[in-house]
């Protein structure tokens, strides 16, 4: 069993490395196309690559493929999500975990107990879980959310800001548990689309024509605002009511392995020591 998992992981990492190499080559080809179309000089790293320019005449536009991590079950079966917390959670974090569980229609909340992370991940993989959500806190305030996809990753780590629970919202109303409509706004970069893929695969696929429930993920300056509303059609139009919870997420790390794998390759990481880090939008 362990040998088979190790072999599958090696094969998967090899495919990802090949895919990454091809995507980098395709980005350079796109830069050549843009420079030729706009009459601008080539960037230095492309201008110095004579082999790339020699092969450009044989270039064919690469077609975007479904990410291998989600291709097996994407759009076919409902995701199986487990929501849990760090050890010894406060009352507020436990309440927040219940509300996050209600965000994802097919999720289950698990009391962490004395589970160490490796045993928790092993239990999730044996039970056919597709995603694990772990919530963290500092002095009773939720501060981080981690999403790990099984069986091979990726793992996305977000910091949490301005968390408002449902009972803190005036006239929040009842929580609807029907499958929601999803809105993803202003995710314009390849990294942003990667985050969209991770988030949307937490929800069941399929058409939801009659669902009155809407969950919005709006990117503003790399802070992802999460809002949940229900709407009712009236004679005069549409009435919208927020039901919560309400919070902002900021991506700070994306790794290619699962949560317990400390040696996993880092796909992207926020680096605050770079001078332009605070002036650049990554999503």
Curated annotation (Swiss-Prot):
One term of GO molecular function: single-stranded telomeric DNA binding
Presence of the UniProt keyword Ribonucleoprotein in the record: yes
Brix domain residues: 79-260
UniProt keyword annotation of Disulfide bond present: no
Cellular compartment(s): Nucleus, Nucleolus
Gene Ontology cellular component list: Mpp10 complex; nucleolus; small-subunit processome
InterPro entries: Brix (IPR007109), IMP4/RPF1 (IPR044281)
Keywords of this entry: Nucleus, Ribonucleoprotein, Ribosome biogenesis, rRNA processing
Gene Ontology biological process terms in this record: ribosomal small subunit biogenesis; rRNA processing
Transmembrane segments: none
Domain of life: Eukaryota
Assembly mode: Component of a heterotrimeric complex containing IMP3, IMP4 and MPP10.
Task of the protein: Component of the U3 small nucleolar ribonucleoprotein. Required for the early cleavages at sites A0, A1 and A2 during 18S ribosomal pre-RNA processing.
Name of the molecule in the record: U3 small nucleolar ribonucleoprotein protein IMP4
Source species: Eremothecium gossypii (strain ATCC 10895 / CBS 109.51 / FGSC 9923 / NRRL Y-1056) (Yeast)
Phylogenetic lineage: Eukaryota, Fungi, Dikarya, Ascomycota, Saccharomycotina
Gene behind the chain: IMP4
């Amino acid at each position: 069993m362990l040998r088979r998992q190790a072999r599958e992981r090696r094969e998967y990492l090899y495919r990802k490395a090949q895919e990454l190499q091809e995507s980098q080559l395709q980005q350079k080809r796109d830069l050549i196309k843009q420079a030729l179309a706009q009459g601008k000089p080539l960037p230095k790293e492309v201008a110095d690559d004579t082999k790339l320019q020699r092969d450009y005449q044989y270039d064919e536009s690469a077609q975007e493929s479904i990410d291998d991590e989600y291709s097996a079950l994407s759009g076919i079966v409902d995701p199986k999500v487990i929501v849990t917390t760090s050890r010894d959670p406060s009352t507020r974090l436990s309440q927040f975990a219940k509300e996050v569980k209600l965000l994802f229609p097919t999720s289950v909340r698990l009391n962490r107990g004395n589970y160490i992370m490796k045993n928790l991940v092993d239990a999730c993989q044996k039970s056919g879980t597709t995603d694990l959500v772990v919530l963290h806190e500092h002095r009773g305030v939720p501060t981080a959310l981690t999403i790990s996809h099984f069986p091979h990753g990726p793992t996305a780590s977000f910091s949490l800001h301005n968390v408002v629970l449902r009972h803190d919202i005036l006239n929040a109303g009842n929580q609807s548990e029907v499958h929601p409509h999803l809105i993803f706004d202003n995710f314009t970069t390849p990294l942003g689309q990667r985050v969209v893929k991770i988030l949307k695969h937490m929800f069941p696929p399929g058409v939801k024509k009659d669902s009155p429930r809407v969950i919005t993920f709006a990117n503003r300056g790399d802070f992802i605002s999460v809002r949940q509303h229900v709407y009712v059609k009236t004679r005069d139009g549409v009435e919208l009511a927020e039901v919560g919870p309400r919070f902002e997420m900021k991506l700070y790390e994306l790794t290619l392995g699962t949560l317990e794998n400390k040696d996993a390759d880092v796909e992207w990481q926020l680096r605050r020591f770079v001078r332009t880090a605070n002036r650049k939008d990554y999503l």
